[in-house]
Amino acid sequence: MKDKREFRTGRGLRWWYVIFAAAVILIPASLYFDAGMKAWVVQHQSSGARTFMQAVSRFGDWPEHVVLGLVLACIAYWRGNKRWTRIFAAMLVACALAGISARVVKVATGRARPNVQTEAGWNGPRLSARYNAFPSGHTAASTAFFATLAFASWRIGLGFLAIPLLIAFSRMYVAAHHLSDVVGAALIGVGVAYFMAQRLPGPIENRESKIEI
């Protein structure tokens, strides 16, 4: 039992090293490519794509994730599946924690959004939404929500990571965020998701459950 705990601890530390290394590499790289990505988005605008991306951005916010998580948690609880009830609850908590973390950082940094005409990109503490670009709250919340599912069950959750990726792209397409805003948000989301996934218990037998685990 001790060896198993030590193995899980070591594996957990390795994941934190990976997340930290990704942040060190990806955030500076994305800052470098911000201007290029902004120019690409401007060049590839179309009315149809913009309408679609606006819809994705609108329905990809945290309230929609919370409603989905609550519905799934209630279904799992009703079906008697303790493991999935806990997973869906962890997804909800991760979504909330990532959203709060992103909010604190964006208010503290005061980064201007791409559609704001200003020479100063970073302006210090600001409450105005026009200067709350870094990081993307939509992306952080969605990534935390679905990455928690992926950490809990990669076979089920891996494909759903396409959802936060689409939401992140939509936020850039509608000129709400820079590339580095969504990259930083995704890293926050993954970190929060892993933090929550570490606190989930192992598989639980549910003899009366109608859901396979």
Model regions and ranges:
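Alpha-helical membrane-inserting segments
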Residues: 34, 49, 72, 97, ...
